[in-house]
Amino acid sequence: MSDEVLARAKMEQADRSAAPTEALLPTFEEFAALSTFERVAFRLTHRMNLGTWKRFWTWCQSFFGAGWIHISTYNLMRIYGLENVEAVDHSRPLLLVANHRSFFDMYVVSTTLFRKTKWQKQLFFPVRGRFYYQNPVGMFVNLIMGWWSMYPPFFVTGKDPVPAKRPFDKYSMRRLVQLSREGAGNVVGFHPEGTRNKNDDPYAFLRPQPGIGKLIKDANPQVIPVFITGLSNNLPKQVLGNWFGGDKIRIHFGRQLDLSEFIAKKDHVRTYKEIGEFLMSKITELAEQDREEFGERRQA
């Protein structure tokens, strides 16, 4: 009988260790780096990305969000390599790393996932906090466009960084690592370039930022490269183009990447940069495939 009790205790201990950990929260010092409004915005958005609330907003995102994006793009959308997304282990988080040319890049990617795949998922898109977490308009956009999925926020990135908020960014990275390391169905969308590429050439890219390398080194998620082309930054023009001859929107999903070589390396900024360069090389390969097939006939 004692053996049965011992075995049951071991099973219960294993169950507890296998259960996902609670969502990380910022320390007092990290939270103090934010303004009053930013704290309120973060508290609300953080709560909306947990438990029942996250499931509710994910349903809204999959039904309403993906629905209107589909209606606005169905004549233009072309998807390639979706079988690579289907082939990953959906009991583990998936990190999608994509080039960044339009405000709407990840919206069309999320619509594709919700409409073309059936496995349970919840999406997270780390963003610059300077818009989405600093004023009511930004919060409203996060609600109606992202269904609160633009989370966690980073403030010391891109143009006009705010160094005083660096302590909070350290928390956001820890939280992003947690989301990328544990949680069945977690899908994290990330742009290695760190900002929108405004070059007229859709096959040109910016240098990757080291943050993506640190994320992968710390979390070791499944990673798939994505190349997106054909999207505008003008919302009315983009929607009207669906019926009046707009550019075709092409999304290429690559094969899952083997990053074991980098995971085994020293935890150093140089390693982070090497990972970023490797990711962009894989996105470039997808871009070259697109160029070879469509480069001379952009409207095809």
Tell where the protein language model's regions lie, with residue ranges.
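A transmembrane-helix-recognition feature enriched in membrane-embedded lipid enzymes
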Residues: 23-80, 108, 115, 120-121, ...
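A generic local structural motif
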Residues: 64, 79-83, 112-113, 173-175, ...
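Conserved beta-strand scaffold positions in the cores of enzyme catalytic domains, especially
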Residues: 79, 125, 151-154, 223-225, ...
